[in-house]
Amino acid sequence: NNETDIYLQWRKQFPLFNFSLVKGNHDILPNSWYEEANIQVHQSLYLAPFNFIHDLNDIDQTINNQNYYFSGHIHPGIQLKGMGKQNLRFPCFYCTPQFTVLPAFSKFTGLANIKPKKEDVVFAIVNDGIVKI
């Protein structure tokens, strides 16, 4: 498609930049495309002290892991209630002491409502900005 062609043209202008992708269920391009785009594809990626994974369910709960995780997959959303029956939902960064879940960067995916705990921090994407909730 047109976007992938534009990306490949742009990528060829910056061949020394390193790009890594932790592949998820929406990353459906053939492996040959990622190779042509000079993108390193991983099932998970460890860059001390961080682990990058697609789905939090992929964490091995049986090990004592002190690393911090970044993931995607669930497309976190926060619901804010206003006066009366006003309800607004926003994609968000969902940050806990153990992990951060990144928002979906697409208007075509749904949102999974999160219920943050007191120690969690949420950053909602509102219009063209990011707001701490």
Where are these regions (language model features)?
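Core catalytic region of metal-dependent phosphoesterases/phosphodiesterases
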Residues: 1-46
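Active-site neighborhood of phospho(di)ester-bond hydrolases with catalytic His/Asp-centered motifs
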Residues: 19-25, 52-54, 69-75, 102-103
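Active-site regions of enzymes building and remodeling cell-envelope glycoconjugates
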Residues: 35-44, 66-69, 117-125
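Core dinuclear metal-dependent hydrolase active-site scaffold
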Residues: 44-63, 69
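Phosphate/diphosphate-binding glycine-rich loops and adjacent basic-rich segments that engage nucleotide
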Residues: 66-71, 75, 81-85
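Acidic, His/Gly-rich catalytic cores of divalent-metal-dependent hydrolytic chemistry
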Residues: 78-133
